[in-house]
Amino acid sequence: PYVSTHPMFGPTFANLGNLSKENTIIIAESDHLGKVFFKDLYTMLKLNICEYTFEEHDKVVAYSLGIPFASTLVFASIMKHQDAPGTTFKRHMKIAHGLLSEDDYLLTEILFNPRTPNQIERIQEQLTILLDIINRKDAAAMKEFLTRVRKNIE
């Protein structure tokens, strides 16, 4: 018997003194008593608990970790020192520093998830669309793009 869980937070960004806004996954195929143990433990820690199959877990991780990890790595890969960075830039840099302070093995495992490449392809598709709009200086298309993006985050 085994039990598999995946806390969806780490010491870099989570407030370990108050985990009530953090999530954890318990794998559905795990041993029943092991799941009960971790559900009790995570409930005491006030974590939001989701139970997923291994397949569902991989989809969630590719989406909720693969996308921001890849986006942050691409951002950081072209960075240079800025004497007068804007607030958005500074926030992105803080995220990049935090992500890159994580263990290389963890980052690699998230990015090598078999479902991550599809998510990165989706990013590339949207970058291609955005670049085309910018190159054409198409204000109407930009407005449509921004409207669609805003709906995505509602």
Model-inferred region functions:
Residues 1-49:
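Rossmann-fold dinucleotide-binding core
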Residues 51-154:
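An accessory alpha-helical subdomain
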